[in-house]
Amino acid sequence: MPSEIAVEKKKLKNPPLQLHYLGDRVLRQPAKRITKVDDETRQLIRDMLQTMYSSDGIGLAAPQVGINKQLIVIDCEPDNPANPPLILINPTIKQVSREICSAQEGCLSIPGVYMDVKRPEVVEVAYKDENGRPQTLKATDLLGRCIQHEMDHLNGVVFVDRVDNSLTLAQELSKNGFSYQAVKPVA
């Protein structure tokens, strides 16, 4: 369900929130559930959206801005003013497809690094919207991948943990100023 929260899709010189990068402990902590969706939560959503748009991103999880909460904002069409963002509060994956596909991913918390990641082709997720209403969504393609990528952040996982080719990954990380020792491979 598209969000009713509206922010201008533009780059700010000084975004409201600071991004955290690979190696920062906050990215490795499991996020806490949001117990009450209120005006403070909605302001955080606005700030996260503005930070995401300012950073040329299509998805952002609260841990990436140092906030240990289960909150995700996504906009797969940031250049389309008519396309509203998707807000997911306390999301849980209900079902994934058996079909796996590989595609290149990047991350605002690991700038400059783009690697192929295998993920289920289809994901069904349950979540609350910005008004605290329960929602479910079945997603494929870029949106499905983005939801899975951002949900990983809520569990202390970053996309490089899912990369198979460790040699190429180590080279890419090093080339962009990151240490391979920050990677924690997941099965």
Curated annotation (Swiss-Prot):
Primary enzyme class: hydrolase
Reactions catalysed: N-terminal N-formyl-L-methionyl-[peptide] + H2O = N-terminal L-methionyl-[peptide] + formate
GO molecular function terms noted in the UniProt entry: metal ion binding; peptide deformylase activity
Cofactor notes: Binds 1 Fe(2+) ion.
Binding site for Fe cation: C107, H149, H153
Enzyme Commission identifier(s): 3.5.1.88
Gene Ontology biological process terms, A to Z: co-translational protein modification; translation
Cofactor(s) the protein requires to work: Fe(2+)
Key words of the record: Hydrolase, Iron, Metal-binding, Protein biosynthesis
Keyword Metal-binding appears in the UniProt entry: yes
Catalytic residues (UniProt): E150
PANTHER family: PEPTIDE DEFORMYLASE
Function: Removes the formyl group from the N-terminal Met of newly synthesized proteins. Requires at least a dipeptide for an efficient rate of reaction. N-terminal L-methionine is a prerequisite for activity but the enzyme has broad specificity at other positions.
HAMAP family listed in its UniProt record: Pep_deformylase
Family indicated by similarity: Belongs to the polypeptide deformylase family.
Name assigned to this protein: Peptide deformylase 1
Organism encoding this protein: Nostoc sp. (strain PCC 7120 / SAG 25.82 / UTEX 2576)
